[in-house]
């Protein structure tokens, strides 16, 4: 640990790797809400948040675990699930009167085609007005899971049972992921209107 009178201890949340205060200050200066995307190895959380001096106010929220309520059988942390989570959160935000936001990716790197931008595309497709560049969005085939279905078709039954055991436990054949994705999106549209 550094010592001396010139040593400055960073803020606790900065030390823990949770908050980039410089980026946060730029985001809260806007009069718009923030679409906050947070990813873990198991799930994704998408929230629409407003700044308030006494603490941020969550206007709408969705977690990828909630997709099972709409019939989604795929994994909760893949690109399809993150897109649907962004879509669900935006539908809830629109129902509460929020029509525009800016993207807040926290400490994640802005990598073209990443899951963070899949959530952004889901929110934009649901009707939320968010500024973005088309180049950063993932391909449509990655969002709806066609690449997983194509990969599964190239495998034999033993490899499918080994690599997609969780899908099979839930009753989903990997080749049917795009169809399940579309059904889930339709169910979200029907339930959130």
Swiss-Prot record:
Recorded GO MF terms: 5S rRNA binding; structural constituent of ribosome
Keywords for the protein's UniProt record, in alphabetical order: Ribonucleoprotein, Ribosomal protein, RNA-binding, rRNA-binding
Alphabetical list of Pfam families matching this protein: Ribosomal_L5e
Keyword Ribosomal protein: yes
Record keyword Iron present: no
GO BP, sorted A to Z: ribosomal large subunit assembly; translation
One GO term describing the cellular component: cytosolic large ribosomal subunit
Family stated for the protein in its record: Belongs to the universal ribosomal protein uL18 family.
Subunit structure: Part of the 50S ribosomal subunit. Contacts the 5S and 23S rRNAs.
Annotated protein name in UniProt: Large ribosomal subunit protein uL18
Organism: Methanobrevibacter smithii (strain ATCC 35061 / DSM 861 / OCM 144 / PS)
């Amino acid at each position: 640990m550094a010592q001396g009178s010139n040593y400055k201890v960073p803020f606790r949340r900065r030390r823990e790797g949770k908050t980039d205060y410089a980026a946060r200050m730029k985001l809260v200066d806007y009069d718009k809400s923030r679409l906050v995307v947070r990813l873990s190895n198991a799930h994704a959380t998408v929230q629409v948040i407003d700044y308030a001096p006494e603490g941020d106010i969550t206007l709408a929220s969705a977690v990828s675990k909630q997709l099972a309520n709409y019939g989604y059988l795929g994994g909760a942390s893949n690109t399809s699930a993150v897109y649907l989570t962004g879509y669900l959160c935006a539908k809830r935000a629109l129902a509460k009167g929020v029509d525009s936001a800016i993207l807040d990716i926290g400490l994640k790197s802005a990598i073209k085609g990443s899951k963070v931008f899949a959530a952004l595309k889901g929110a934009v497709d649901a009707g939320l007005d968010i500024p973005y560049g088309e180049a950063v969005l993932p391909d449509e085939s990655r969002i709806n899971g066609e690449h997983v279905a194509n990969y599964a078709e190239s495998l034999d039954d033993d490899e499918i049972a080994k690599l997609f055991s969780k899908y099979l436990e839930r009753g989903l054949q990997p080749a049917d992921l795009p169809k399940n994705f579309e059904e889930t999106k339709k169910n979200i549209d029907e339930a959130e209107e």
